[in-house]
Amino acid sequence: MPAPVPALLCLALALASAQPSPPPPPPFPVVATNYGKLRGVRAALPGDVLGPVTQFLGVPYAAPPTGERRFQPPEPPSSWAGVRDATRFAPVCPQHLDERALLRDCLPAWFAANLDAIAAYVQDQSEDCLYLNLYVPGGANGKKMADDVTGNDHGDDQDSRDPGVGGAAAAAARKPVMVYIHGGSYMEGTANIVDGSVLASYGDVIVVTVNYRLGVLGFLSTGDQAAKGNYGLLDQIQALRWVEENAGAFGGDPDRVTVFGSGAGASCVSLLTLSHYSEGLFQKAIIQSGTALSSWAVNYQPARYARALGERVGCATPDPGSPPGSPPGWDSASLVSCLRGKAAGELARARVTPATYHVAFGPTVDGDVIPDDPQILMEQGEFLNYDIMLGVNQGEGARFVDGLGGGHDGGYGGYGGGYGGGVEDDEVQDGGPDGAAGGVSAGEFDLAVSGFINDLYGRPEGRGDALRETVKFMYTDWADRDSPEARRKTLVALFTDHQWVAPAVATADLHARYGSPTYFYAFYHRCHGGGGGGGGVDGVAGGVAGGVGGEEARPAWADAAHGDEVPYVFGVHMAGPGDVFGCNFSRNDVMLSAVVMTYWTNFAKTGDPNQPVAQDTRFVHTRPNRFEEVAWAKYDPRGQLYLHIGLRPRVRDHYRAAKVAFWLELVPHLHGLAADPGAYLSAAATRAAPSGDPDRDPGGGGGGRRRPRPATRRPAVMTSSSMASGSGMTSSSGSGMTSSSGSSASAVLIETRRDYSTELSVTIAVGASLLFLNVLAFAALYYKKDKRRHETHRRPPPPRPPQAPPSAAAADRNPRPDPGPAGRRGGECGAVVTAMAAEASAGGLGHDGVGGVGVGGVIGGVAGLRLACPPDYALTLRRSPDDVPRAGAGPGTMTLIPGALGGGGGGAVHGFNTFGSGVGVAGVAGVATSQAGPGLPHGHSTTRV
């Protein structure tokens, strides 16, 4: 008898439960790399949406750059025996968070606003700092179910690349790798600040954050072989080599590597796409708020700042070959040797302040890592092999305006006290709409614009004033020109457009010109919540500690400032309380962060931010978000489509097109560079710092020039006279590389450019003369046409045939009443007119086709005859323009109606018609013509005669 079905089910369940379940993954997994084994730590993330992540922290990717390796390219790391602990962060690269030395305008808003919190991450500094951090997703609790390919940590610690461990399944499950380059104006910052766990778990990607050499140690250059510079960029390239070699050990795909960064990190990413050293190391790039075309992206005067550094730290070594009594030269090799002997902290603390909108120590055009000017490389298509996604934030330039206006001392950033830490205005604290009392005054506006133009374009005679006035005109809100708040808003737009938007659009145009996949975004959201912790959102931590100062004091005018997209990219809103990003995030913030992470990781997977994972944030809201209905279109130079990222997303086109065209097209022409587009600029170019003391305070005067498109282009070129001045730095090998020295010879000579003021004056004079002659000719033509019209359309009809006088009988049958004296005078006038008409007809004046007497023609035909009676005003009223018959006498006859002048009717009889709507043509062969055009003399003219 068969067993009952319930009994069989119970037996099966018992057998299944008797089998041993797989052991839970260990809390400290071990992975074998090419250089040795690493022990990481498995971290659980809050909420039901995020799965666990394995972190490998402080992993060396290069040998320590100490001793003789200082100011040298990085070398691969040495192997180690045993298992290396990778559960703690490694020391950060030397830097100095001095408020006076920070380039705050180019720092992320959250960085500058929370220096006290940032300082905690950079306390442990060492020149041995070339380490990276890995965040590897794993576990079945993640939103995107991910296989734990790091499960090679049992028993013998086998390598996951071994076919015996996972085999083809492990190879098929390899995850994309996203390598993050942190920002900080090349002088400060660390990858340890940003936690990649949430991004890795939510997007199912491996996230790598990289520390690289900063400031003097990372970017010192003498302009010759003694110190070529770009060591920080070479560190990043070495990190990418390490990822290529070892990504498989962590389950990553070395053929799907995406490099992304924000601010100075974005500029580094942009430069990496142009360097042949990084070919094959990554396939996609995400450039957030910064490109290689910005004025602060590349340093074109490295030797000048190297010399200034030597003077600061006591390494000003005279050239032994210089004759006695001559200005001391500079031996670059001796300078570098001296700097190698200095402590790293001393070099980091040395204050060498760059010119405004420039950097003292940053990437340089060395002919090797960066072989040429970035714009030239882009125009040559050096970066077309990469898929690129790039964009800007709405209010990138807010920090440039920070501190302007009454009631401020440091603005929303406070220059060291959190958002609003320095704000004293009651309206801001009370949540007023303006954010600061008084906004920006007219004087402050003029000074800000003048300083901006002077620092970037110099003070060329004549053209500088015209350029300043043009910029003021373009960035004046003429609908509210007297409003201080409007001035502040337009100033933010000015700095944003010039420093971020125009370079980004120029980069996108150059990349998409030949069809390379390009996506552009504009980020329009910032946190509006108050400081302090908060509750969770459906299993996702929704509160982040208020940090320093708190977001509640951040004024409304700040918009989405520089760096505000970073916490949304890394999912800080889901990670729980923190101390760097000071805001209590709302449900909308959590939703938008999920959206941004989906876009970023989709792009890393496929090169298309729309796939393979669809937008879905129902874990935050019960209803779908608006991004589910938006398809992010590719960018192309013609359509210029971009995604507006905010709570109301939409795909739009031509982001700030008018202002971008102003900076990329008009400003270079206004500055007089269009006549010589191939000429290299002087050392005072916009990409190069203005001449003068490199340690002057930012905002001081300086000269500068730029070439067209995108307005910050070319490196310095020195004239023979400046090379022979003997006041610059020369290498020991006699390379002849020259830098300025002293006030008398501090500036590299500017190439002589032709003055076009005389030609312009002559052109204007000739044009005015031709215009006057045209006006005279037109007036004469009009007079002749008017006279001809009167002569043609006032001609009398032919005389009527003679009629027999009425008989006396008929007269008796129809007696006429006596008209009286007036009537008799009218009759007399009629007789006179009849006689005049007959005489005119005999003179050949003809018929006017209207059927009435042409008074003008009569008077013209018998000009010598004067009427002996008063005029008949009834006739005048009948022959008013409104009563002129409109039908022609026959085919082909055209009647010109004087009443149509200035009214309706046909088109103008001349291209520069002075009438309101042209001379009206009633009709030709019975067909009415179209209405006249507008009243201006020409469609593109404002001249009235």
From Swiss-Prot:
GO cellular component: cell surface; dendrite; excitatory synapse; glycinergic synapse; plasma membrane; postsynaptic membrane; postsynaptic specialization membrane; synapse
Pfam family membership, one: COesterase
Basic residues: compositionally biased ranges: 787-797
PROSITE patterns (UniProt xref): CARBOXYLESTERASE_B_2
Tissue and organ expression note: Detected in brain cortex, septum, hippocampus, striatum, olfactory bulb, retina, colliculi, brain stem, cerebellum, thymus and skeletal muscle. Detected at inhibitory synapses throughout the brain and spinal cord (at protein level). Detected in brain, spleen, lung, skeletal muscle and kidney.
Region (Disordered), start-end ranges: 145-167, 685-742, 787-828
A GO term for molecular function: neurexin family protein binding
Signal sequence interval, chain numbering: 1-18
Disulphides: C93-C129, C315-C338, C527-C583
Effect of inactivating the gene: Mice are viable and fertile with no obvious sensory deficits or major perturbations of behavior, but show subtle changes in synaptic signal transmission and signal processing. Mice display subtle deficits in reciprocal social interactions and communication. They have reduced brain volume.
Basic and acidic residues bias: start-end ranges: 145-162
Membrane topology of the entry: Single-pass type I membrane protein
Cytoplasmic topological domain residue ranges: 783-945
Gene3D superfamilies, A to Z: alpha/beta hydrolase
Keywords: Cell membrane, Disulfide bond, Membrane, Postsynaptic cell membrane, Signal, Synapse, Transmembrane, Transmembrane helix
Extracellular side: 19-761
Membrane-traversing stretches: 762-782
Keyword Cell inner membrane: no
Subunit structure and binding partners: Homodimer. Interacts with neurexin NRXN1. Interaction with neurexins is mediated by heparan sulfate glycan modification on neurexin. Interacts with GPHN and ARHGEF9.
Record function comment: Cell surface protein involved in cell-cell-interactions via its interactions with neurexin family members. Plays a role in the formation or maintenance of synaptic junctions via its interactions (via the extracellular domains) with neurexin family members. Plays a role in synaptic signal transmission.
Family: Belongs to the type-B carboxylesterase/lipase family.
Protein name in the entry: Neuroligin 4-like
Gene source species: Mus musculus
GN (gene name): Nlgn4l
